[in-house]
Swiss-Prot record:
ACT domain ranges (all copies): 4-78
SUPFAM superfamilies: ACT-like (SSF55021)
Tagged with keyword Transferase: yes
Main EC class the enzyme belongs to: transferase
Protein known as: Acetolactate synthase small subunit
Subunit structure: Dimer of large and small chains.
EC number: 2.2.1.6
Gene giving rise to this polypeptide: ilvH
GO annotation, biological process: isoleucine biosynthetic process; L-valine biosynthetic process
PANTHER family recorded: ACETOLACTATE SYNTHASE SMALL SUBUNIT (PTHR30239), ACETOLACTATE SYNTHASE SMALL SUBUNIT 1, CHLOROPLASTIC (PTHR30239:SF0)
Amino acid sequence: MKHTLSVLVEDEAGVLTRIAGLFARRGFNIESLAVGSAEQGDVSRITMVVPGDENTIEQLTKQLYKLVNVIKVQDITETPCVERELMLVKVSANAPNRAEVIELAQVFRARIVDISEDTVTIEVVGDPGKMVAILQMLAKFGIKEVARTGKIALVRESGVNTEYLKSLESKF
């Protein structure tokens, strides 16, 4: 199972290297990684997606807490949260199929950020499922390049069930 970990760390040089080193030494893979400033200026939030069972994640959490600059580690996989990812996709789109590519982007509420004679570059923001869905739909046109950020996530203060919100979102 994939787990989403939210890690608060002191914003100092080498922290990410130590965390990556810990994962490498233990033979764990990081499938997605996003790092940025948190609410306090001297703290960064690392959001990572890691495959593993409950025991593996518990062990990783304990190991992360042993690192000097780690403030808080939270497995937010089962916690109601807001998740987003950003993706840029460059798609083959000559004159005959360009309108169809643009229309497909609009269906996914994506933005066209660049158009050339032979390609369209699309910016997609949403949950990881949306990324997979639009890539599947664009595949028939020929995907030239893809660049994705890692997943970012914040716990919902309202405690509203994420699955319930997704079901509402799909109705509109």
